[in-house]
Amino acid sequence: MNFYVDVLGCPKNEADCALLKAYLEKKGNNIVNTIEDADAVVIDTCGFILEAKKESIEEILTYLELKKERDLKVYVTGCLVQRYGEELKKEIPEVDGWFGILPPEKIAENIGKESIIPKNPEPVYEFGGRVDEKQYAYVKISDGCDRACSFCTIPLFKGSFKSRKIDDIVKEVEYLILSGKKEIILVAQDTTGYGIDLYGKQMLPELLKRINDIPGDFWIRVMYMHPDHITDEIIEAFSYDKVLKYFDIPVQHGSDKVLKLMNRTKKSEHILKLVEKIRKRYEDAVLRTSIIVGFPGETDEDFEELLDFIKMVRFERLGAFIYSDEEEAPSYHFEGKVPEIVAQERLDILMEEQSKISFEINEKMVGKTFKVLFDEEEEGVLIARSYMDAPEIDGNIFVPGKFEEGFFKVKVTSADVYDLEGKIVEE
């Protein structure tokens, strides 16, 4: 059977589906790159916030419309199924199979046979091959979460924090490097917690050392580091030559009152000291963060504190979102809900401020030369990234040329708010 795999949501889903594709192939199936060539589709869904849930449902319904026109099997997996599986089965009976959070191998074994929605998620898997199309690959080092952020429902459907064995992760990365991957992106709900459940201590520094020791010319990028648990040892581990000086630290807010309501255990002063420590250690550090605006109880004064915080830190990369009121999250019951129109205004103001910061930073890049990877080519223009940018969520460097694999040197010739333009230069 020809399978098309449609990945929605976060990079952790991409990591899961890379393995799922390999297991489907082991069962004698083919993986195709377009739905037109497929006999079956697997949709890996997101169930985190309202917009993601809407997107997942719309995608399912789109494929079911195709199913009316031709012979097409539709299978759905991922967080949305784990969270709402029984309800979905009743509401959308046309789907051929539902699979909650399971090891990819188990999904491949049961697809076409029976639906499986486990009472307790089973997210941790052992490496068994994978199929990737890009020069970069997401590698999931743990799943689930033991944090108790008041806005978040992930622990409810992902379960408690569970780390993969370090040898298995290294084995997967070795496979990826041998297959030609040039960027390894480590993902988890909180990468700083890696290893605590298995080894009794934070093992991210040891994992980075083990991966850094693998022969080859490649990058290591770390995503999703909780600011409360970034130790000096973790910061020092970024000194390994293959580890990018890219610190993805979702701080969520800059007001101490709002941080407390979010059940974040540290205050903004801790974050400021952490940022200072990182920038003192690495002059070329790039800091990325995520912000939630419109959290219940967020006043105009709190938002002004957030703006002042952003102006003070000057994050190189920032993503911001309006609070999503999830019925199973503790914050759902909080008073002081912010009207949507006010939350949108605050988001617009925040992003306008960040756009100024981003443009000022980008202007300083003009004339500099960076080592880059090309992600794709569109009409003779290459979409490149330096160490400063993660795939899909950050900016790009647009370069004239034809796609080639491997690393290249690009000199920046002009800057925009979030993106750069450049030209290939000789080594």
From Swiss-Prot:
Function field: Catalyzes the methylthiolation of an aspartic acid residue of ribosomal protein uS12.
Name used for this protein in its record = Ribosomal protein uS12 methylthiotransferase RimO
Q: Where does [4Fe-4S] cluster 1 bind?
A: C10, C46, C79
Highest rank taxon of the organism:
Bacteria
Q: Does the keyword Mitochondrion apply?
A: no
InterPro entries assigned to the protein according to its UniProt record, in alphabetical order: Elp3/MiaA/NifB-like_rSAM, Methylthiotransferase, Methylthiotransferase_CS, Methylthiotransferase_N, Methylthiotransferase_N_sf, NA-bd_OB-fold, Ribosomal_uS12_MeSTrfase_RimO, rSAM
Gene Ontology BP annotations: tRNA modification
Q: What is its EC number?
A: 2.8.4.4
